[in-house]
Amino acid sequence: MNIYLVEDDEIYAEFIKKSLTQNPGYTVKHFHNAEDALAAVNGKLPDVMIVDYKLPGMSGIELYEKIKSLIREENKVILLSAIDDGNMVLSFIQKGVRDYVIKDETVIESLVAILEGKEDEFLFN
């Protein structure tokens, strides 16, 4: 599974990258900002994009808006945020975001559950 990680916090990005690449078949390419990730997309999305909401320059939701027309059933775009705000999550959903993960102690488990299509199993256990 080809994953683009868009995260400006180098340490946090390395944590996510190392954790996810322990799973066979996962490759993670890290981008420090939305502009670089958008340039890499170049009309074709990777299998998954994990995008921090708060980035320097273009925000994660702005990046989502720019790539939304490219998203197909086989693609996933997961927004990450340290902010646990119901109104913000509702605004993401209204814009079409299907997957949102809070940066907390379960972030890796949440991401893996989404990547494996087991969100419901993870959420309701």
Identify what each model region corresponds to:
Residues 33, 59-62:
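Acidic catalytic/metal-coordinating carboxylates
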Residues 30-48:
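Acidic, metal-coordinating helix/loop segments flanking the phosphotransfer/catalytic sites
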Residues 7:
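Conserved acidic carboxylate
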Residues 10-29:
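Two-component/phosphorelay signaling modules centered on CheY-like receiver
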Residues 56, 85:
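The feature encodes the CheY-like receiver
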Residues 52:
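Active-site residues of response regulator receiver
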Residues 61-73:
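Short amphipathic alpha-helix used as the core "switch/output" element in two-component signaling
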